[in-house]
Amino acid sequence: MGSFSITHWLILLVVVVVVFGTSKLRNAGKDLGGAVKGFKEAVKDENTEHAKKHVVLDHDAGTNPPNITGTQSDTTSANKVDDTHNV
């Protein structure tokens, strides 16, 4: 009762072809296929960009990171303050 038999599907197909015509259905199929192809290419491009970023990050991880603690600049600014008080 809940599922359709093959005859119901064939009748539905005939009604759709009569209402929309074969040319509109063919164009809709081409458009749908193009959209799916574009989506797959976008996902593929996103995956390759993501993989390239990981390669670059892994390559950078092997080098010594720069000293970004700021201790050198803090000592020079402290020396400048001390120099002004000593004068």
Curated annotation (Swiss-Prot):
Gene3D superfamilies, per database record: 1.20.5.3310
MF (Gene Ontology): protein transmembrane transporter activity
Compartments in which it is found: Cell inner membrane
Keyword rRNA processing: no
Pfam families, A to Z: TatA_B_E
Compositionally biased tracts (Polar residues): 64-79
Topology relative to the membrane: Single-pass membrane protein
Principal subcellular localization: membrane
Cellular component terms (Gene Ontology): TAT protein transport complex
Membrane-spanning residues: 1-21
Region feature Disordered, mapped onto this chain: 56-87
Record key words, sorted: Cell inner membrane, Cell membrane, Membrane, Protein transport, Translocation, Transmembrane, Transmembrane helix, Transport
Repeat keyword on record: no
Annotated InterPro entries: TatA/B/E, TatA/E
A GO biological-process term: protein transport by the Tat complex
Function as written in the Swiss-Prot or TrEMBL entry: Part of the twin-arginine translocation (Tat) system that transports large folded proteins containing a characteristic twin-arginine motif in their signal peptide across membranes. TatA could form the protein-conducting channel of the Tat system.
Subunit structure: The Tat system comprises two distinct complexes: a TatABC complex, containing multiple copies of TatA, TatB and TatC subunits, and a separate TatA complex, containing only TatA subunits. Substrates initially bind to the TatABC complex, which probably triggers association of the separate TatA complex to form the active translocon.
Family under the similarity heading: Belongs to the TatA/E family.
Name listed for the protein in its UniProt record: Sec-independent protein translocase protein TatA
Organism for this UniProt entry: Psychrobacter arcticus (strain DSM 17307 / VKM B-2377 / 273-4)
Recorded name of the encoding gene: tatA
